[in-house]
Swiss-Prot record:
This protein's name: Methylenetetrahydrofolate reductase 1
Enzyme class per UniProt: oxidoreductase
Pathway the protein acts in: One-carbon metabolism; tetrahydrofolate interconversion
Record GO terms (molecular function): FAD binding; methylenetetrahydrofolate reductase (NAD(P)H) activity; methylenetetrahydrofolate reductase (NADH) activity; methylenetetrahydrofolate reductase (NADPH) activity
Cysteine-cysteine disulfides: none
PTM sites of type Phosphoserine: 355
Binding site for FAD: 53-54, 82, 112-114, 130-131, 153, 173
InterPro entries from the UniProt entry: FAD-linked_oxidoreductase-like, Fadh2_euk, Mehydrof_redctse-like, MTHFR_C
Residues binding substrate: 114, 184, 276
GO biological process: methionine biosynthetic process; tetrahydrofolate interconversion
Length: 603
């Protein structure tokens, strides 16, 4: 989505917003670390956009579009791609714009840019001498395909710059077609506000995003201020010098200084904060949290025509997507990747399930984003099924924030069924996804609500879990006695058993809204379930492989992934939310049938 369109959207227009800048790392490991960081930062709340820098002289012309593609398509966060014209031919400019457009990126930050290190700037054959030339070229040849941003320099591009003259150059870029301004970093907030007043007086009325540089450490703070030529207010020095040899102290005091600066900006009516992250996250999170913005924008955008299921549209064709299988509820990026080649995405209902072919699960990109050390720190080294059950129970109690099948903490809606989930997991019915019954909750409800205002939302109770083979027959027989309950069961090989009609979707979430058809955003369906099981078992095997080959934990988890069944149960009687869990109250548990398996170490 274009930044200019977002700024007009009611979910963004009146709010304080934030956005991030990242730069392309030089190694593949660095790139993966960046993706992991973005994945974490996305859970804080919804950034308006993420921008990715362009190397001097086009040195990252391959890497920058690739990173933009992953952020836009896989993480479903709207992007803004930097594009410089230094040492760039017209063909290179067109190629970069084409790649950006293909990924769904509709925002370009047009810059002159610096020459490659140890070379002088020369005007290329393309005739791009200034950023205004690039803005004119994009607007002339691509019309309104892109929202174009330009740089603003509140303290001048260099220390000797005439500010009034630089504002004239800024006005030229705006006249050529720029839609928004991202400014150079600064610390003198009073000077910045005065500069904004001058910009407005010059007839420049497009949105301004102030560039906020968090203070991470003393040396980097001084180096960046000197490099960019910005003024450091005396009270910054008075606050930081006493702790300059203490990185934690500098970060803590630096956060307070930046928070104070942001509050002053917001009070003056400047509400679009743009963070230069330097590919780091801790200080940025501290600032956002202390500004009271953490998680504030996490709810999905709802416009007047469509209900979007994701934080931002990854591609224009996903804007109207309205239905997804529930299995990927906590693994959105993987679902987008596996459906990226679909010609049509379901909108009002889930279509013929025989038509879409899910792509293969990309375990390298969408597998566990943790090192073996991080896995053992987070999940320990379980040595029995009882210990695994306790681990899953701790996730349901919010004592740990993730499991292999969910990168996110368990949702607040699960509080309604927490006791039932705890009982299931401690009896070795290992739950990886669930939702409680809802019967006409207001669409504005802070936990359960979604969709347009003045509506009502409904849910069928649903639970997905792994079960030991010795319990499978008893499970199916118990379910069959409850006419309202449907089940789907498969093993690692994909042998499916169900008491439902094959390939017929079962809506498990729906909403009723004024002047609208009923919206059914999540479903359960057999073909999707079989596609999901490949991913579910793969994630479990990745967890196992984090331990040494001869370890008890490795053997235990491998055995579980090879032998246990993956089950989904839906109670179609959503007015009776307890009957689904009555299934497990009527059953024996693994520790009842095989205590030697439940408590014993793997051999």
């Amino acid at each position: 989505m274009k930044i200019s369109d977002k700024l007009l959207h009611p979910d963004w227009k009146e709010k304080v917003t934030y956005s991030y800048e990242f730069f392309p790392p030089k190694t593949s490991t660095g790139v993966q670390n960046l993706y992991n960081r973005i994945d974490r930062m996305k859970t804080w709340g919804r950034p308006m956009f993420v921008d990715v820098t362009w190397g001097a002289g086009g040195t990252s012309s391959e890497l920058t579009p690739g990173i933009v593609n992953v952020i836009q398509t896989d993480f479903e966060v709207d992007t803004c791609m930097h594009l410089t014209c230094t040492n760039m031919s017209t063909e290179m400019i067109d190629a970069a714009l084409k790649r950006a457009h293909e990924t769904g990126c509709r925002n370009i930050l047009a810059l002159r840019g610096d020459p490659v290190k140890d070379t002088d700037w020369t005007e290329g054959e393309s005739g791009f001498r200034y950023a205004s030339d690039l803005v004119r070229y994009i607007r002339t040849h691509y019309n309104d395909e892109f929202c174009i941003g330009v740089a603003g320099y509140p303290e001048g591009y260099s220390p000797d710059d005439d500010i009034d003259e630089s504002i004239k150059h800024l006005k030229l870029k705006v006249d050529e077609g720029a839609d928004f301004i991202v400014t150079q970093m600064f610390y003198d907030v009073d000077n910045f506000i005065a500069w904004v007043d001058k910009v407005r007086a010059a007839g420049i009325n497009i949105p301004i995003f102030p560039g906020i540089m968090p203070i991470q450490a003393w040396d980097s703070f001084i180096r960046r201020a000197k490099w960019s030529g910005v003024k450091i207010p005396q009270h910054f020095m008075d606050t930081l010098v006493p702790v300059k040899d203490d990185d934690e102290g500098v970060r803590e005091r630096g956060v307070e200084l930046i928070v104070e600066m942001c509050r002053k900006l917001i009070a003056s009516g400047i509400t679009r904060l743009h963070f230069y992250t330097m590919n780091l996250e801790k200080a940025v999170k501290m600032i956002i949290e202390r500004l009271g913005l953490l998680d504030e924008n996490l709810a999905p955008i709802v416009d007047t025509n469509n209900v979007e299921l994701t934080n931002a549209s990854s591609q224009d064709r996903r804007i109207n997507e309205g239905v997804r299988p529930i299995f990927w509820r906590t693994r959105n990026e993987s679902y987008v990747s596996r459906t990226d080649q679909w010609d049509e995405l379901p909108h009002g209902r889930w279509g013929d399930s025989r038509s879409p072919a899910f792509g293969e699960f990309d375990a390298i990109r969408y597998g566990l984003r943790m090192s073996p050390k991080e896995i053992t720190t987070s999940w320990g080294s379980p040595k029995s099924y009882s210990e695994i059950g306790d681990l899953f129970a701790r996730y349901c109690e919010k004592k740990i924030s993730s499991l292999p099948w969910s990168d996110l903490p368990i949702s607040d809606e699960a509080d309604l069924i927490r006791d039932q989930l705890l009982s299931m997991n401690r009896n070795a019915f290992l739950t990886i996804n669930s939702q409680p019954a809802l019967n006409g909750e207001k669409s504005s409800h802070p936990v359960f609500g979604w969709g347009p205002p003045n509506g009502y939302v409904f849910q069928k109770p649903y639970v997905e879990f792994f079960v030991h083979p010795s319990l499978l027959n008893e499970l199916k027989e118990t379910v069959k006695k409850l006419n309202s309950v449907s089940y789907f069961v498969t093993n690692k090989n994909g042998d499916l058993d169900t008491n439902s009609q094959y390939e017929i979707p079962n809506a498990v979430t729906w909403g009723v809204f004024p002047n609208r058809e009923i919206i059914q955003p999540t479903i359960v369906e057999s073909t999707s379930f079989l596609a999901w099981k490949d991913e579910a078992y793969s994630l479990g095997m990745e967890w196992a492989n984090a331990y040494s080959p001869d370890s008890i934990s490795r053997k235990l988890l491998v055995s579980m992934m090879k032998e246990w069944f993956l089950c989904v149960i839906v109670d179609n009687d959503f007015q009776n939310g307890q009957s689904l869990f009555d299934v497990f109250n009527k059953m024996r548990s693994l520790k009842d049938i095989h205590p030697e398996l439940y408590y014993a170490n793997a051999s």
